[in-house]
From Swiss-Prot:
The gene is ZRT3. Residues 127-142 have a biased composition (Basic and acidic residues). This is Zinc-regulated transporter 3. Transports zinc from storage in the vacuole to the cytoplasm. It is found in: Vacuole membrane. Residues 280-295 have a biased composition (Polar residues). The modification Phosphoserine is found at residues 178, 188. The chain crosses the membrane at residues 8-28, 42-62, 75-95, 336-356, 371-391, 398-418, 438-458, 482-502. One of its GO terms (biological process) is zinc ion transmembrane transport. Keywords: Ion transport, Membrane, Phosphoprotein, Transmembrane, Transmembrane helix, Transport, Vacuole, Zinc, Zinc transport. It is a multi-pass membrane protein.
Length: 503
């Protein structure tokens, strides 16, 4: 049997190490499974470890040194990689984000999405949540003012009556679709707005502005309990100081609600099915029952009858229902996982190429072996980083392992094989490759992913939940902090720098 070429052997060993790194994720998951809520630690600290390794890999190992000969390749390539990463991140969130409806109102009575949410958890700030938080009540709906242009008595409205009456005097709803709406073909209520366009009443002296819904909910159990909204006040900012209570920012409260990841995943899958089966002729009815997830992860559907309170006010035609697209833990991890697998797979092609090029002759034997040793730890950590986001976000865990095995385990040998066919029959000094631009693009891509991982790990960690009735030991086991995420990030940096000792 002919001896296996050194470059092929090194490539196969690197692939096996990548797959072993991927298998560490389910093993650690089983180890943490015996402790309640401790799997969130694996996600938070694992993302931080991967972030440190990726940031160091991008800036220290991949990014070429800027010299006079390549200065017009390195920086443009880095910039292109960063832009591509942001664009791909935007596309993923466009398809996987939650759509939240905000409804315009005068502020005289409860406004908002009319959500009926239930929660038995409270945030890390140790504020307890009411088990039944209603942002509007039946009394408000029954006594809604007649200026809305619809029946004011609940007895006069049956289930068969139209929710929106044909009133020629009522201004038409402004419909402005965003790029996200166009990409996903979603038919959401009103205009797509940025969260910053919801001007809080506490920061505005102009009464025509609408508070970011809902108003403050007063709870007998907590100092503050507002699971849904950004800022605002129940009394247009005129109540006493003791009634001025901050509102949890809905974007951060939803985006880092890792504990209820399964609900956001279920919401995403059900909404995909809903939008695919929706036809233009029944759009008028479907848009009034917009499904989304509450900030605390409860699966919520708007009450269609409550949307009678969202009509235009004749005195202010500029106010209209609108919606926001919010990132969720599902969309964040899905985006990170897709980008990580894509970039690391592309990154392993030049790695395999380099392994072949430095091991093709006896003269470069020592250099090729040192590069192989430096890539051992590197490949192990990369396998872990590729698997963790998908393993967390997918319901079928074996899919995450399979993706890493195919992309991570197969890309490096494939890159070495491509190098073999390119340089077959040439002398070692012929056709020396210049991959500065390709490495710069990959470095820019990897840099953004690493920063996203670190941001997400800290957000998940600082936004974790404690539960009523937990003992001191349970709270200690489920507790995680951003400071510990920083330590794990530094550990990832040291792992990559330690691998450079062999070069």
């Amino acid at each position: 049997m002919e001896k296996i070429p050194r470059w092929l052997l090194f490539s196969l060993i690197s692939s096996v190490l990548c797959i072993l790194g991927a298998l560490c994720v389910p093993l650690l998951s089983v180890a943490f499974d015996s402790k309640r809520n401790s799997q969130s630690k694996l996600v938070n600290y694992g993302l931080s470890l991967s972030a440190g390794s990726m940031i160091t890999t991008s800036l220290y190992m991949l990014l070429p040194r800027i010299e006079k000969s390549n200065r017009f390749k390195v920086f443009p390539g880095l910039l292109l990689g960063i832009c591509l990463s942001f664009f791909l991140n935007y596309l993923v969130h466009a398809f996987a984000s939650e759509s939240l409806v905000h409804c315009a109102d005068s502020g005289d009575h409860a406004t908002g999405s009319h959500i009926h949410s239930k929660s038995h958890s409270h945030s890390h700030s140790h504020s307890h949540a009411d088990s039944h938080s209603n942002f509007s009540n039946d009394h408000d709906l029954e006594n809604a003012p007649s200026e809305h242009g619809y029946a004011t008595s609940s007895s006069s409205v049956s289930e068969n009556d139209p929710l929106i009456t044909k009133d020629s005097d009522r201004p038409q709803m402004k419909k402005k679709m965003s790029l996200i709406d166009l990409l996903t073909r979603r038919k959401s209520e009103g205009e797509c707005c940025d969260l910053n366009k919801c001007t809080p009443l506490l920061q505005s002296e102009q009464p025509e502005y609408i508070a970011c819904v809902p108003p403050v909910i007063k709870s007998s159990q907590s100092e503050r309990n507002v699971p849904h909204g950004c800022e605002g006040s129940e009394d247009n900012g005129q109540s006493d100081d003791k009634d001025h209570r901050g509102l949890v920012c809905v974007e951060n409260n939803i985006g880092y609600d890792l504990e209820n990841l399964s609900l956001y995943r279920k919401n995403f899958l059900s909404s995909r099915h809903h939008h695919s089966s929706e036809s233009p002729e029944n759009y008028g009815s479907n848009q009034l029952s917009h499904s989304f997830s509450s900030p605390l992860g409860n699966d919520v559907t708007e009450n269609p009858a409550a949307l009678a309170d969202t009509q235009y006010h004749p005195e202010n035609g500029s106010l209209y229902p609108h919606h926001h697209h919010l990132e969720t833990p599902f969309s964040k991890l899905l985006s990170i996982g897709m980008q990580t697998c894509l970039v690391l797979a592309l990154h392993k092609f030049p790695e395999g190429f380099i392994i072949f090029y430095t091991n093709r002759s006896d003269s470069s034997k020592s250099l090729g072996f040192s590069i192989f040793l430096s890539l051992t730890i590197h490949n192990f950590v990369e396998g872990f980083a590729m698997t963790l986001p998908f393993y967390t976000v997918f319901e079928s865990k074996w899919v995450a392992i399979l993706i890493t095995a195919v992309l991570g385990g197969g890309s490096q040998p494939l890159g070495a094989l491509i190098g073999y066919f390119i340089f077959k029959g040439s002398t070692p000094r012929d056709h020396e490759p210049n991959m500065d631009f390709l490495l710069s693009v990959t470095a820019g891509f990897l840099l953004v992913i690493g920063l996203q991982m670190f941001q997400t790990g800290i957000g998940f960690s600082d936004g974790h939940h404690h539960h009523q009735g937990e003992g001191d030991e349970e709270m200690k086991q489920s507790h995680s902090s951003g400071t510990t995420c920083l330590k794990w990030c530094c550990t990832g940096v040291l792992l990559i720098l330690a691998s450079a000792l062999f070069t």
